Amino acid sequence: MRLCDRDIEAWLDEGRLSITPRPPVERINGVTVDVRLGNKFRTFSGHTAAYIDLSGPKDEVSAALDRVMSDEIVLAEGEAFYLHPGELALAVTFESVTLPADLVGWLDGRSSLARLGLMVHVTAHRIDPGWSGHIVLEFFNAGKLPLALRPGMMIGALSFEPLTGPADRPYNRRQDAKYRDQQGAVASRIDKD
């Protein structure tokens, strides 16, 4: 059962859930908290690798990822990031989120943006219990026109679901937590699997 707006506010007030900066009450509705787009992005360099063998030797996977991922792009205030049709890019939420060991989060895109072809997550929309950091968005433009994305715009909504009890291995305590405390648009670390 997901937390309703009243319970989200209570969890925030009690410090059981942290969203920084704390969203105003106007952005907490029904079962969701609206989140905004941050100013950090990464793109994929075109045709710098013939392919990436995801199950190949880790050093080869790592080298291929280094070839295809751009350095982090940090936009200045007022700048826009242009996502062209058929392109995939990474970005982050403006807000940082910290979940306790007994709560899982879910990121959903906005219907108004989806109707223009923008997907804010390709498959990874679960936020594990114990997570702390900015949420990476996996943008894909399935539309016909380039989309201008500006830091600060409403980009998605988070919902939260209590677990039956605290997880024994929450994300922030796992030794293999590849994205712990991420602050930017961190590229895939599949080579760390």
From Swiss-Prot:
Assembly, per entry: Homotrimer.
Comp. bias regions, Basic and acidic residues: 170-181
Keyword Nucleotide-binding attributed: yes
Organism name: Enterobacter sp. (strain 638)
GO molecular function: dCTP deaminase activity; nucleotide binding
Source species taxonomy: Bacteria, Pseudomonadati, Pseudomonadota, Gammaproteobacteria, Enterobacterales
Chain residues that bind dCTP: R110, S111, S112, L113, A114, R115, D128, V136, L137, E138, Y171, K178, Q182
Protein name: dCTP deaminase
One BP term from GO: dUMP biosynthetic process
Record-listed E.C. numbers: 3.5.4.13
